[in-house]
């Protein structure tokens, strides 16, 4: 069997390398960079090698029949599409995440749910 490996940041992953642990943040930051930084710091403290966010375009990934359904959120009642927008990071927020992760030596990435999110 040939040796299979890839490089992520400064780390090699694959045959013969230590396990690569990813902390899933998803959208648990509630659209708040400071909360995201606290979660990243916790993942670093726990020994994670990387953290992963989720990125989606609400109009593409939220079924239209659910857009106007009101729900309880940490910010009170709002439509589902408004909630989906509130928890999404944009370029400005991801730039702050990138800067913070570089400062503490944490690899980060985001799984994109649609082409526009890429």
Residue ranges of predicted features:
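A structural motif
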Residues: 47-48, 106
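Active-site beta->alpha loop and helix N-cap motifs at the rims of alpha/beta catalytic domains
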Residues: 74-118
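Non-catalytic positions within long, well-ordered alpha-helices that form the structural scaffold/packing
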Residues: 44-45, 102
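Active-site beta-loop-alpha junctions enriched in small/polar residues
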Residues: 26-28, 56-58, 113-115
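Hydrophobic faces of well-ordered beta-strands that scaffold small-molecule active sites
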Residues: 21-23, 51-53, 108-111
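N-terminal amphipathic alpha-helix/helix-capping segment at the start of soluble metabolic enzymes
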Residues: 1-22, 94
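Conserved, mostly hydrophobic/aromatic
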Residues: 24, 43
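Glycine-rich, proline-tolerant flexible connector loops at the mouths of alpha/beta enzymes
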Residues: 49-88
